């Protein structure tokens, strides 16, 4: 199964999902599936910016010997983004409407991340 197929499957399975992306920790997009429209100017650019938040969280956890960061969520008035580490170099992120199914998004990230890691 291709990266895009996994990302598309996550988007189709989560109510309110507007995007699912596989990205490098450097913020470079590997692949993204967009669905619907978000009330945000540019979802792709926003997800790239969020990669910096994930990097900062990982560095803070390492500095304080708190262990590895598995997941980071960012909720704004217009969008909720949940990112999950796939490997030390990659993560996947789902963006959804504030009233979207956050629990299902988190579950699908958890079960899909190992599949993507095998394909990297």
Q: Language-model segments: what does each one mean?
A:
Residues 1-120:
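Non-catalytic interaction/Regulatory regions outside core domains
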């Amino acid at each position: 199964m291709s990266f895009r197929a996994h990302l598309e499957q996550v988007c189709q399975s989560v109510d309110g999902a507007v995007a699912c992306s596989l990205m490098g920790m450097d913020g470079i997009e590997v692949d993204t599936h967009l669905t619907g429209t978000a009330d945000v100017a540019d979802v792709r650019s926003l997800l790239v910016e969020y990669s910096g938040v994930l990097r900062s969280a990982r560095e803070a956890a390492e500095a304080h010997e708190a262990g590895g960061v598995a997941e980071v969520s960012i909720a704004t008035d217009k969008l909720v983004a949940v990112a999950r580490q796939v490997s030390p170099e990659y993560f996947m992120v789902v963006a959804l409407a504030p009233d979207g199914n956050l629990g299902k998004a988190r579950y699908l990230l958890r079960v899909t991340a190992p599949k993507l890691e095998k394909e990297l």
